[in-house]
Amino acid sequence: MVVSDPIADLLTRIRNANLAYHDRVDVPGSKMKKAIVQIMKDEGFIRDFEWIDNGHQGVIRIYLKYGPNKTRVISGLRRISKPGLRVYAKRDQIPRVLGGLGIAILSTSKGVMTDKQARQQGLGGEVLCYIW
């Protein structure tokens, strides 16, 4: 299946699995998706992930995280920069998500990182998505 926006597809699959209380979700793999999922793990939004080599593209298996009584850890995911409308932020214009409760994921010249890391390093870049 050809997907015009792979990052939006990743976020939609995670959102749908989260709303259905699934334990895991499989998404087609890429370096960019792996970097985004690694940030989600480091920030505590998912439990874990693994790369499954299937001979060509690879698959990322994401293990979702829930709190006590099956409360969702991920409240929302939003794609910001889209193929039809790219959104860039200078280093002093990096957005804060819910006053610092969520994260913005940026693609910078030094790789994919959170809004906090980009501010610390003084970098701007493409705002990929918000997670809260």
From Swiss-Prot:
An example Gene Ontology molecular-function term: rRNA binding
UniProt entry tagged with the keyword tRNA-binding: no
PROSITE patterns: RIBOSOMAL_S8 (PS00053)
Cytoplasm among keywords: no
Record keywords: Ribonucleoprotein, Ribosomal protein, RNA-binding, rRNA-binding
Domain of life of the organism encoding this protein: Bacteria
Signal peptide residue numbers: none
GO biological process terms, semicolon-separated: translation
Chain coiled-coil ranges: none
Family indicated by similarity: Belongs to the universal ribosomal protein uS8 family.
Function: One of the primary rRNA binding proteins, it binds directly to 16S rRNA central domain where it helps coordinate assembly of the platform of the 30S subunit.
Assembly, per entry: Part of the 30S ribosomal subunit. Contacts proteins S5 and S12.
NCBIfam families listed in its UniProt record: PRK00136.1
Annotated protein name in UniProt: Small ribosomal subunit protein uS8
Recorded name of the encoding gene: rpsH
